[in-house]
Regions:
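Helix-rich terminal scaffold detector
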Residues: 1-14, 179-308, 312-318, 434, ...
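A ligand-binding cleft/hinge motif common to bilobed small-molecule-binding domains
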Residues: 471-489, 580-609
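Periplasmic-binding protein-like
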Residues: 493-505, 599, 603-632, 652-657
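Short, glycine/charged-enriched hinge/interface segments at domain edges or termini
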Residues: 2, 6-13, 66-236, 368-378, ...
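Short loop->beta-strand "edge-of-pocket" segments that line small-molecule binding or catalytic clefts
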Residues: 419-428, 522-547
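N-terminal segment of the mature folded domain
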Residues: 441-523
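Short, low-complexity N-terminal leaders and the immediately following helix N-cap/first helix
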Residues: 1-79, 106, 121, 324, ...
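Flexible glycine/proline-rich
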Residues: 14-17, 32-37, 46, 92, ...
């Protein structure tokens, strides 16, 4: 086995593509004939010509009476023409009647036109009594008749090679009597996730283990690109198991995708295993990009193997850039669907120095309907970063920042960009999740995008018109009042309203039984207390800092000096649940959060204060239907009862749902 190379050469994306194409030229893989019921989304391999006329006979396009047009000339409302009804023709039967001068036959839509007739008069312009028919409107020859071959004639091209089959094209194939169609074969793809920490979804999860995300994500991406997954597996980080899975993939598939085991850390085996198969082996090992540095490409027995990074967002980003185009080409799918869109940066963006960065972003609409790119703040290992991101911005290595409102191109993760009905940017709260659950029971298709950036970020998002509403709980140090004083401070007095939400009990989340005997914020200064803070700009963080300021005044010192004594003050997280989880698993002794989170995790709670969690809403969005539905739900007795039941520590009031400014 060859000696392992640890990212010997980091390639640019362009150089990596060039090297890949020198050894692997994606091309269609041949054709296969399949039944129409299996053909949706497939690509036609050959031109299809009509073997029959469509329709195969002259047929009525309306319910009415088949007649000779000349018999109706001169007919009008006051002077109807009278003819004799000599029979009827139903859909699907061969007409047995022949129409002579002065005669008509009743006919159904789609039925064959009887001999002698050259028009159909609509039933609305007739009056039938016994065998006599009065006609109140003249028709022209051919009127209300679909002539044989008028849709498709024998030998005419019905569909052309390379067309992707949608329900419309399948209808055409059915109309010309084809039960099967020749299509390009889908590339077969093996998807392998690697890591000792991985457990298949549905399995038992123990501490230190995580569910395998990547194989599900990548398998779905393969299907959207036009491929089919022939093997989906989880491999342990052992040479034997990983090698076995790769060999199975090479046997069953045209292309192999792995994720994980690509970095230069101990226990990562993929590079060595792939290089052990012989020449050419590993061709790319490391990209000068973020995320995606540990990407691998190899050619094994004439088949391409892509080693994607282990983090979900990194894996999908590199898949989009390198793998999707290859699979689409192999499936003979033309990129007619737009996978890039234009947007503007919602805020100033700082980039990684010296490395090209693919920055995941949310896409939201501002007041004018223009798209704004809002960077996800979690790392590439966070599943929320992946689930909420619509695509990514390509930032060159020589660019250190993008300015607010700077124009950018966003590469979409999927061609199916679904705009959100409701955009909520602000402070995280479990009660808001319960409120959205309540709405979705009656509006299951509601698309809501929630971006947790804290109360300060929520006020800024509303000020810039980026969100419909924001959850906020900012305490004004001077007045002791929540949220209302900040309308003036952010210039929102005339633009937005505060809708009363509910009271939240804030305090210190501690282990069951409170083994460290923590009684209040002052105890955080103890040497034996490990702490985790909330993110800057969040109402909870501001609440802590105000408490430290009061203590600093009492002790005749500064808040900064007190903060420096707290073990973990600089360690931040974005949610109350994250604080509770850290306490549960013994990572910290205490963190400031809401009682609801402590109850959910079976932990103890040391009350500090009660605060108001309200909704900040742009006035012009109050008439937006999803906002109206949200406010109706907020005011309902059903929601208030559910909030009390599901979220102890969140307390609605008589003012809940009222505009208070």
């Amino acid at each position: 086995m060859t000696e392992r190379k640890i990212f010997r050469t980091l390639l640019s994306l362009e150089e990596a593509r060039k090297r890949i194409l020198e050894h692997f030229s994606p091309a269609p893989l041949g054709s296969e004939e399949i039944p129409l019921e299996m053909a949706l989304g497939r690509v036609i391999a050959d031109d299809v010509c009509a073997p029959i006329d469509v329709p195969g006979f002259d047929r009525a396009s309306m319910d009415g009476y088949a007649i000779r047009a000349s018999d109706t000339f001169g007919a009008e409302e006051r002077n109807p023409v009278k003819v004799k009804v000599v029979g009827a023709v139903e859909t699907g039967e061969n007409p047995q009647v022949q129409i002579e001068a002065g005669q008509a036959a009743e006919i159904s839509t789609g039925a064959a036109i009887p001999r002698g007739a050259d028009a159909v008069v609509m039933v609305e312009y007739t009056q039938h009594s016994e065998n006599e028919l009065k006609i109140f409107r003249a028709v022209n020859p051919g009127e209300n008749i679909m002539a044989a071959g008028s849709d498709l004639m024998v030998g005419e091209h019905a569909l052309r090679k390379g067309q992707r089959l949608t329900p419309k094209e399948l209808g055409v194939l059915s109309a010309i009597g084809l039960a099967k169609v020749k299509v390009h074969r889908k590339p077969r793809v093996a998807v392998i996730s690697s890591g000792n920490e991985l457990v298949p979804p549905g399995g038992h999860l123990t501490y230190g283990k995580i569910y395998d995300i990547n194989s599900t994500i990548i398998a779905a991406a393969v299907a959207e690109s036009g491929g089919e997954v022939s093997l989906q597996a989880v491999a342990q980080d052992t040479e034997e198991d990983l090698n076995q899975k790769i060999e199975a993939g090479l046997e069953r598939a045209d292309l192999v995708l792995t994720s994980g085991s690509t970095s230069a850390g101990v226990g990562d085996l993929l590079y060595r295993i792939l290089d052990s198969y012989g020449q050419p082996g590993v061709i790319v090992h490391g990209l000068a990009v973020k995320p995606g540095k540990p990407t691998i490409f190899a050619m094994i027995n004439g088949k391409p193997v892509f080693g994607l990074p282990g983090y979900p967002t990194s894996a999908l980003t590199i898949y989009t850039l390198l793998v999707h185009p290859a699979i689409a080409t192999m499936a003979s799918i033309q990129e007619s669907e737009q996978r890039t869109t234009h947007a503007r940066c919602a805020s100033r963006v700082h980039s990684a120095r010296g490395r090209r960065e693919f920055l995941p972003v949310h896409l939201i609409q501002d007041e004018t309907g223009s798209l704004l790119a809002y960077p996800t703040t979690e790392g590439s290992g966070a599943i929320t970063s992946l689930s909420m991101a619509d695509g990514f911005i390509d930032i060159p290595e020589n660019i250190q920042f993008l300015e607010e409102r700077e124009s950018v191109d966003v590469q979409l993760f999927s061609s199916r960009l679904i705009p959100s009905d409701l955009v909520i940017i602000g402070s995280h709260c479990i009660g808001l999740d319960i409120l959205l659950d309540h709405i979705r029971r009656t509006s299951p298709n509601l698309q809501a995008k929630i971006i947790n950036v804290g109360s300060t970020g929520g006020f800024n998002a509303i000020r810039r018109g980026e969100a419909d509403l924001a959850g906020v709980h900012l305490l004004d140090e001077t007045s002791g009042e929540y949220n209302l004083p900040f309308l003036e401070r952010y210039g929102l007095r005339e633009k937005a309203v505060i809708v009363r939400g509910y009271v939240r009990q804030q305090g210190l989340i501690v282990a069951k039984g409170n083994p460290k005997g923590i009684k209040g914020i002052e105890d955080l200064l103890r040497d034996d207390i490990a702490f985790m803070n909330r993110n800057r700009g969040s109402g909870t963080r501001i609440l802590l800092d105000l408490g430290l300021k009061r203590t600093a005044r009492e002790q005749n010192t500064t808040m900064e000096k007190l903060a420096s004594k707290i073990r973990g003050y600089e360690t931040e997280t974005k949610s109350h649940s994250a604080i509770a989880s850290a306490v549960l698993y013994g990572k910290i002794d205490a963190g400031l959060g809401i009682r609801t989170a402590a109850e959910m995790y079976g932990l103890d709670f040391v009350p500090v204060t009660e605060e108001r969690y309200d909704l900040l809403i742009l006035k012009k969005r109050l008439e937006k239907d999803p906002v109206k539905r949200l406010l109706d739900a907020l005011r309902s007795d059903e929601f208030k009862a559910e909030l009390k039941k599901r979220a102890p520590g969140l307390v609605p009031s008589q003012e809940t749902g009222m505009i208070v400014n």
